[in-house]
């Protein structure tokens, strides 16, 4: 697919916002709605993991293609339609500059372009998209392929912030880019606090924590210092939930009024969960989410209790 063709298909983020939604129209609360969250399609990991060669493996990704096609098919069948479909990072397995990256990216774009055009895509960067220690070059490559690496948008009276969590993990090779996101985030959190939006929600790849704010540092979470500072900023600004991936298992916990939601993968499972998607219903008072296996969502769609919430 050409770059121009990709731009036509994906509602890509530019200028730190998402052109799929008019921020002025969307600032007013108009009633309950829902969106779908997925994470880690990570084309190539299943083969790499099965052979024990996660650094250089991943020369096949037919399984991930089929799973992501099933996810897209399930989303397209949903009625009513979700407001958007967010993918929380690790779009492909091949790191920047490595073999198979172009092919994996091409195949993922081919699958994602089938998403109903009335369901905008929201794309979040992960460590495999940018490298564990991103550089200005890897960030630029992501932005050229998928749109801005961090941005905000309004939907139905709720403010959504998309973060580049690699800057929070290791920004040693691009400190100026991290500082720019930090400054932008402070501005956005100030807006969330002052405008008293109905809800404010964050999307990022790496979770703040997996279960508890005071858990030990791990590959799958942010360091204690970073997570505590960020969690405090979020709670002060009234952020209600953070949705992430990265762990390839379902997990999560709470800190004060903040819900940290960790969703398992569309692709490779590292625990006992199933390949799946999370449905998130936003009502005037609360945010209700439920993880569905791809088979469940394909066969039965939204559960009746979630449908009832949409009528409130």
Curated annotation (Swiss-Prot):
A divalent metal cation 1 binds at residue 90. A divalent metal cation 2 binds at residues 90, 127, 246. One of its GO terms (cellular component) is cytoplasm. Disulfide bonds: none annotated. GO terms for molecular function: metal ion binding; protein serine/threonine phosphatase activity. The keyword Phosphoprotein applies. Its main location: cytoplasm. This is Serine/threonine-protein phosphatase CPPED1. It comes from Rattus norvegicus (Rat).
